[in-house]
Amino acid sequence: MQAVVSTPSGERWAELREVPDPEPAPDELLVQVDAAGINRGELTLMQMREDFRPGQEIAGVVAAGPRSGERVVGLADWHGWAPYATVPEHRTVPLPDDIDFTTAAALPMAGCTALNLIRLSGDLLGRNVTVTGASGGVGVIAVQLARLAGANVTAVSAVDDSVADGQHVILESAGGASLDHALAKVALGGLILVFGNSSKEPSRIDFREFAGRDRVRVQSFFSAHYEHLAADNLRTLLGLVADGRLKVQIGLETPLADVNDALDALSERRVDGKAILRVAST
């Protein structure tokens, strides 16, 4: 089968290359992939690793075994940008017929990251919450979940002077100057949850920035530490989508063969919402 393989030493991000068909382990499902999500972290890994096969967010149909023919969505260990992929069974859930594969493929990493961030933020009823990277795959969902939790939400690309003082929670993914500004905007006893650095710029933390804002916490978040929650999180998110309370914004949908164009668009910040590869149509 033809799968996406990274080529950081070449002129483009990746190439389609013939690879062996995957063989599922006893605790895995073999899935015929219909749609696969693209995450910004995968761009970083593709620049670092030769012959890397990205793709964790997949939605499709179980291709073998007792569950053959079942529509599922899940979080793979990689190798998802391909016609077939294996996924740990404990990180997959059935996909309701009324939710399409494209929508579902936006949830296993981006959606679950947003949900985990909101849960780590504590009780948000009446609290001031700022979400950075608010037009991205994680941000679009985090903004909606924070509002569902009763927060007063400020949605921005990065924290700057336009953000009001007294933010109880800041979900920070821009890094650099944005994180510097977050230190000046957070409330007494507030929380800054750092889950990315899309600017690739260093941040300066000056103790004096905390003057008048005692007990502020700056906490890191890495999605890999929460993968065991994927199935429960996916069930929650799918329920919200089915009820119409959560809208998944697809900013780019392209065939697998055009993966380099999709990666260029995401890298150049030309995608609002989630970028999705359509595998079945390739």
Name each model feature, range by range.
Residues 76-89:
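A structural motif shared across PLP-dependent enzymes of the aminotransferase-like
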Residues 105-164:
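Mid-domain Rossmann-like dinucleotide-binding core that forms the NAD(H)/NADP(H) cofactor-binding site
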Residues 155-159, 173, 196, 222:
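N-terminal Rossmann-fold cofactor-binding loop
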Residues 71, 128, 152, 190-192, ...:
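Short glycine-centered segments of the SAM/dcSAM-binding site in methyltransferase folds
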Residues 177-245, 279-282:
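Glycine-rich phosphate-binding loop and adjacent beta-alpha segment
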Residues 73, 170-171, 193:
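N-terminal Rossmann-like NAD(P) cofactor-binding module of classical short-chain dehydrogenase/reductase
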Residues 20-37, 42-79:
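Glycine-rich beta-strand-centered segment in the early N-terminal region that forms part
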